[in-house]
């Protein structure tokens, strides 16, 4: 991902203020509610029958935390996301058969969640920087599909 030093600073500063566990749980929960067809990859998570069931599901919350911690780790590798996420891309492509569009959906939902959490502090400049990050991560995760 091509980012200026100023954009990288915006991203890391906001990430440092984010409750990653809560944001991860909310992000994955929202993906599963807003895009219900994504639930097919999480049948082993138990009850996903309603928005409340999804948002309160401990397995959804735990996996959302895991996903966002991985994204946070990727922030240290913005110049080489494809290499950093190569193993995860292979796992999601070859073993889990996840539709790569889901990575884009999750990234966009994360941006919405961050906007909600940070309010006015999530300026258009911060949003633009995060859109670059989530697009870069989605592309890296989809890399093995090509």
Swiss-Prot record:
* Record: residues binding heme b: 63, 92
Presence of the UniProt keyword Transport in the record: yes
* Keywords assigned by UniProt, alphabetized: Acetylation, Heme, Iron, Metal-binding, Oxygen transport, Phosphoprotein, S-nitrosylation, Transport
Q: Which domain of life is it from?
A: Eukaryota
What biological-process GO terms show up in the record?
hydrogen peroxide catabolic process
- Per UniProt, what is one GO molecular function of this protein? metal ion binding
Where, per the database record, does this protein carry Phosphothreonine?
Answer: 12
Q: What is the tissue localization of expression for this protein?
A: Red blood cells.
Give the S-nitrosocysteine positions (modified residues).
Answer: 93
Q: Which residues carry this modification: N-acetylvaline?
A: 1
Tell me, what does this protein do in biology? Involved in oxygen transport from the lung to the various peripheral tissues.
State the protein's name.
Hemoglobin subunit beta
Query: From which source organism is this entry?
Result: Echinops telfairi
What phylogenetic lineage does the species belong to?
Eukaryota, Metazoa, Chordata, Craniata, Vertebrata
Underlying gene: HBB
